[in-house]
Every structure is written in C-alpha cells, then in structure tokens.
Swiss-Prot record:
Top-level taxon: Bacteria
Annotated signal peptide: none
Species this protein is from: Cyanothece sp. (strain PCC 7425 / ATCC 29141)
PANTHER family: REGULATORY PROTEIN SSL2874-RELATED (PTHR38449:SF1), REGULATORY PROTEIN TM_1690-RELATED (PTHR38449)
Name this polypeptide is given: Putative regulatory protein Cyan7425_4125
Protein family membership: Belongs to the RemA family.
InterPro entries in the cross-refs: RemA-like
Length: 91
C-alpha cells in the first residue's frame, strides 16, 4: 500500500487516505467543530499564526487547520491521486 502525502502549507504534511473532508472555516457548524476539537485536544493548528483558510477533518476525529485555501488543498489531494493512478497503470 502506497502512502500518499499532501502538503498543507509551511512544510506540514497529512496522509491523503486519512482525510475525510476539506472545508472552509467560515460557517457556524465548522466553527463549532473546531471549538469541540480544541476542547477534546484533537485540534492540530498548522497555520503558523496565520489566518485559517482550510479545515481538514481526518478519519481519526482530528481537525487540522491550514493557512492555504481549501481549493489548493483539494487540488493537491487530486494531484496525488492522479499521479498514483497514472504510475500504477501499465504502459
């Protein structure tokens, strides 16, 4: 099994197969999820003090904050999948 890693900014990397959702932090339900994760000790702040622009929800229940746009994280996620798909196909 290949491990796919996604760069979420500032040298921080998450495992692609653990990601459930990549969302914007603007809505009230997402803000509530962030608050609950902070209280449970399951919040990982990878923003380096910058504004949170993407919230990544992992299958372990961890919530990861990133300073890059959700679209950018999603594109990196898709690129990591495409690279794997093209490298595994016989030519």
């Amino acid at each position: 099994m290949d491990i796919k890693l996604i760069n979420i900014g500032f040298g921080n990397i998450v495992s692609a197969h653990r990601v459930i959702a990549i969302v914007s932090p603007e809505s009230s339900p997402i803000k509530r999820i962030i608050t609950e994760a902070r209280e449970k000790g399951q919040l990982i702040d990878a923003t380096y003090g910058r504004r949170t622009r993407a919230v990544i929800i992992a299958d372990s229940g961890h919530v990861i904050l990133s300073a890059i746009q959700p679209e950018t994280v999603a594109n990196r996620f898709l690129l990591s999948r495409d690279v794997h798909d093209s490298s595994s196909s016989p030519c």
